[in-house]
Amino acid sequence: MALLLLCSQLGLNAVPALGVESALGILEIQLTDHREAIGDFSQVKLLIEKILLSPRSGLQFWRTGWQEIAPSSDSIDLTQLTGKKTARIFRGEIPPGAFDAFNIKIKTISAVLKKTRRSASIKNTVGPVKLAFEVPAQGETLLVIDLVVTDFSDHPPQGYELAIKGYELYTNGKLVEKIPPE
C-alpha cells in the first residue's frame, strides 16, 4: 500500500515537469547596414559561418565559453540592407538565460565595386561584442546588429573594412538599449 501511494505521488509530481519544455524563449538576430561606403558597391555578400553567445556564468562558474547557434540564413547581401531594411540571420527557441556577449563569425566577404565592376577586398574586423542581455522564458529578444563598410583607402595601405557600427536590443517588443544612441 505504501509503495502504491509512493508511486502515485511520484507520478503526480512528474506531470508538471512536462510543461518545462515550453518554457523556452525566442531569440531573433537581424543584420542591417549603416550607410557609409556601401554605396561604392553593387554587391557585398557575407557568408555567415556561425553565431556565438557567451552565457553569463554567475554562480555557475563552470558554465563558461561560447554557445554556438547555427544561422538560419548563411548568405546576405549588405547592399540590400540600407535604410531601415534588415535581414534575419537567426530566429528560434533557445533555453532562457542571461548572456554577456555575442559574436557573428563571417566566413567570407565577396564584394563588387560599382564603378569598375571588379571584385574588391573588404577586411573583416567584426569580432565579439560585450553586451549583457537576457532571453526570458516564453519571451522574445530581438538583437539588430548594424554593420558598416568604411573606406580607409585615403590612408594607404588600408582599404575597405567591415565592422559593427552599433546595435539595438529589444525585449518583448520594447527597446532596451541602443548603441550609438540617437
Where do the model's predicted regions map?
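Sec-dependent N-terminal signal peptides
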Residues: 1-5
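A short, solvent-exposed, low-complexity linear motif enriched for acidic/polar residues
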Residues: 7-182
